[in-house]
Amino acid sequence: MLDRRSVLRSGTALTMLAASGSAFAKPAPPEAAKLNALFDTFMSEALDRQPEGVTSLGLDTGSRAYQKGLLANRSLDEIAALKQLNVSQLTRLSAIDRKALSGMDGVNYDVILYGCQQQAQTDKRFQYGAIGTGAPYVLYQLGGTYQSVPDFLDSQHQIVSKTDADDYLARLSAFGTAMDQEREAAEHDIALGIVPPDFVLARTLEQMTKLRGTPAEKSPLVESLARRVKQKKIAGDYAGQAARIVGEIVYPALERQMTLLKSLQPKAVHDAGVWRLKDGAAYYAASLVSQTTTTMKPEEIHKLGLDLVNSQSAQMDALMKANGLSKGTVGQRLRAMFDDPKFRYPNTDAGKDKLIADLNVKVRQIRAMLPRFFGTLPKANLIIKRVPKNIEAGAPGGYYQPGSLDGKRPGTYYINLRDTAEVPSWTLPTLTYHEGIPGHHLQGTVAQESPLPLIRKISGFTSYVEGWALYTEQLAVEFGLYDKDPWGHIGQLHDAQLRAVRLVIDTGLHAMHWSREQAIKYYADTLGDPVSGATTEVERYCVWPGQACCYMIGKLTFLRLRDKAKTALGARFDLRKFHDAVLLCGALPLAVLEQVVDAYIAKNKA
């Protein structure tokens, strides 16, 4: 998900989106007009700094075409400048008279103000971490340019013309500088005592070694360009040029990062939680506020997780017994389901292709059902791809990448197929509903296609975004999608249980000093997952403190607000209209979401 501060509006975008921008639908009141103009300025300021964001949004044309050959500045000076920019934006936004704003203008103001305030507080107190990611470490198994730039160049840098191919080479040349800047940022944090745990260093080096171990001419960075220029019949020795850049610029910079991480290994500790870092308890408290957009305390979240684990275990137990599974604990029975060959796709390329084909059938089936439950439907297409092999070792089981604003690049649901034993068939429906439709793709695309200002279209509040996706997993049950699929229903409950387990483990690791091994055992025992999958998940929570808590807290908020609207409106409650109310406003802090639902209730009561 793109960060609010990473990608903001350009003049080109203003022309492109004039028909959809709220400022253009009708003359705005003076203060609202000032607000929308300020939003446009904020967008332009950040787009100037984020070439990758420009490309991701499909805005690297016209006056911003030059940015297609650039990568963002990742230097320490630029990090300081970004922090100063946020303070400046907060000052300018605070000068707007909030009392003079109404409706969505007020909501938009509240959302951006919240984001600026939270970022300013974090920047002031903590002088370490990967800016804009929520991670305390600059280099880790889930983040860093060594991982993000190859994926970006392959999946988002479009190649249609010779200029596009030349821009690819320019970005490839800039990749080395980006890695060196990032290494210097990591060295800054290391001097403050911010060193990843030993297992994070090992996992990160494993992935870097895999990238570096490929001969330059066979690197995915080279093959991606070579394949696409051939498809477009673009003349020139692009493969040769790319291989030289990879061998002479990219690999040496990657080796410098690897050397740094290797130098940390002898003294790295095994403690998993951020409690051990400088001001670590406060860092975790701030992470929980930033990620969940609530004021819930670690102890409160931990207890909520334990209570949910117990109640959802009882639901799974009953469903399993009804389908002939009665021996052992719920976790042991889930383990048996993971091990049952009847639920496994062959761990071959053909088997993996069949798995993706089956997921596409599932997407088509639920897309046909959407008009019954949603008023506004996504226009942009969804495609399903494997997680790239060079990053699948440390990547999550599935994730979503938004499409471009113009719809030319579809939204993409990535599924990790490093081992099909980790994704048995009974786990796939709920994962697909979460990442695709009616989860992330529907929510993100409806926001992108809505009449919101662009700064709001790309707002990414995790508790809302992931809360919505988990809420839609529950919707699938209510839609009757599991009426004839008890195994898939168990999969849905398993994934709900996963989100409860995350509440327990995240707070356990970062507030209660759990070890990595304790967390892995609790995960595997409760959920029945293979230890390999449990390990990947737990190591993810170690580097993204608080993020794992967003899913269930967000889901419970959506369910509570839906019940609130049902109770208030009675026979006037319309699920389609409720979904429009909570989707067309874009991603929000949960407190602002409640304000939106209250306004929806008041409007429909009248």
Where in the sequence are the language-model features?
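N-terminal secretory signal peptides and thylakoid transit peptides that target proteins
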Residues: 1-15
